């Protein structure tokens, strides 16, 4: 049974001649890690913003647990590419910030924040200031903050796009560990093909102008990592390489088609 449902979603900016998104149908079920991948102009971020409730669709319906999404809500935790952390708060204060706004007593919210810091391998970092953290550590704090409110769904907007290659791989592996431990459904958007293939239990390929779904792939590479197989072994598996090359060819053909129409 799906927790999150998108039915015939369309989106168009005022004054634009072409919709950003057209006829998008998606569902996110329990323990699923759904990744949306596509070139620039395919509407990835617009799609996440619709699910988060930051903007309303031009057409169609979005429901979470059968309830229409009509704005932002604590049941949807969001992790952004830019860490969006509060520089005047320490790490613990950042993770606990949403709980503070919700009126959770201090002792309870700090205990929850420390629990989430342990989950993302930042034990002992609670008193550090944001400027003392590396890029990867900031993203761990952002992930811990999103999880602290115990959302029904975790939304991730190209969360590792600004990180160096080594840190990006570390964060991908951490996300799979957190996903396995918490059983939270995740909707993640990315432009990184290898990342998408490695993480996704379902991979949705988007084409641009207007953004639309052109292919869906059911994958298990992330589940294999979560079950204990090494990332290196998975990424050298011929099945992984074949899938990555197939997705690369599809994305390349979309970009080429877009250039020919320009």
Curated annotation (Swiss-Prot):
It is a peripheral membrane protein. InterPro entries: AAA+_ATPase, ABC_transporter-like_ATP-bd, ABC_transporter-like_CS, ABC_transporter_ATP-bind, P-loop_NTPase. Its EC number is 7.6.2.7. Its main location: membrane. It catalyses: taurine(out) + ATP + H2O = taurine(in) + ADP + phosphate + H(+). It is an enzyme of class 7 (translocase). Signal peptide: none annotated. ATP binds at residues 38-45. It is found in: Cell inner membrane. GO terms for molecular function: ABC-type taurine transporter transporter activity; ATP binding; ATP hydrolysis activity. The keyword Cell inner membrane applies. It comes from the Bacteria. SMART domains: AAA. GO terms for cellular component: plasma membrane. The keyword Ion transport does not apply. Residues 4-233 form the ABC transporter domain. Keywords: ATP-binding, Cell inner membrane, Cell membrane, Membrane, Nucleotide-binding, Translocase, Transport. PANTHER family: TAURINE IMPORT ATP-BINDING PROTEIN TAUB, TAURINE IMPORT ATP-BINDING PROTEIN-RELATED. NCBIfam families: PRK11248.1. Belongs to the ABC transporter superfamily. Taurine importer (TC 3.A.1.17.1) family. The complex is composed of two ATP-binding proteins (TauB), two transmembrane proteins (TauC) and a solute-binding protein (TauA). Part of the ABC transporter complex TauABC involved in taurine import. Responsible for energy coupling to the transport system. This is Taurine import ATP-binding protein TauB. It comes from Pseudomonas putida (strain ATCC 47054 / DSM 6125 / CFBP 8728 / NCIMB 11950 / KT2440).
